[in-house]
């Protein structure tokens, strides 16, 4: 039996949430290679949080390293990354909706890869699923996203010069998801 990609979330979902879950499932296949193969195999209760956590990290990473069709300054990228964190910290606020729409409106100009651009343009759907998660899961997700964001921003502002730097950067972008998964 193949596990449901939506886990427990879909059983209590309204139409907008089901549509958003369907989008997230499609987006995962579009923007990921290895995680698109493994996330659907996780037990039902963890599927939606892991999928959404991955997509949110992918959005953050897009502003870190997909510099787009025009030069996007370091300041603009940092501002966008901080806006993502503000959205995730207060996902139910009007500010979150407004900032998600602002990021979506900048995607055509800022994001070169068409799949990542589509994900940023549909941040509202990822946010809809995020909102449906329990408070403990959201708090854990935000905590680890802060860690990822801090590391990404550090290495946006300074190159990786040594193996020690590389080790630290790898922790921020690859080790932190393990912390989130452990807390789940």
Label for each model-derived stretch:
Residues 1-184:
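Acidic catalytic motifs of isoprenoid enzymes
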């Amino acid at each position: 039996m193949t596990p449901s990609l939506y886990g427990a979330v879909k059983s209590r979902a309204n139409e907008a949430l089901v549509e958003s879950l369907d989008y997230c499932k499609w987006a995962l296949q579009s923007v990921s290679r290895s995680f698109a193969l493994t996330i659907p195999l996780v037990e039902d209760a963890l599927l939606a949080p892991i999928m959404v956590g991955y997509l949110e990290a992918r959005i953050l990473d897009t502003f870190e390293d997909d510099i787009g069709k025009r030069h996007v300054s370091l300041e603009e990228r940092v501002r966008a990354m901080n806006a993502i964190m503000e959205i995730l910290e207060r996902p139910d606020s009007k500010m979150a909706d407004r900032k998600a729409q602002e990021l979506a409106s900048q995607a055509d100009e800022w994001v070169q890869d068409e799949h990542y651009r589509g994900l940023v343009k549909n941040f509202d759907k990822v946010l809809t699923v995020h909102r449906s998660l329990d408070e403990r899961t959201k708090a854990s997700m935000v905590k680890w996203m802060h860690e990822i964001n801090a590391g990404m921003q550090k290495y946006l502002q300074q190159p990786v010069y040594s193996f020690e730097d590389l080790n630290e950067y790898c922790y921020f972008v690859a080790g932190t998801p393990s912390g989130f998964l452990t807390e789940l």
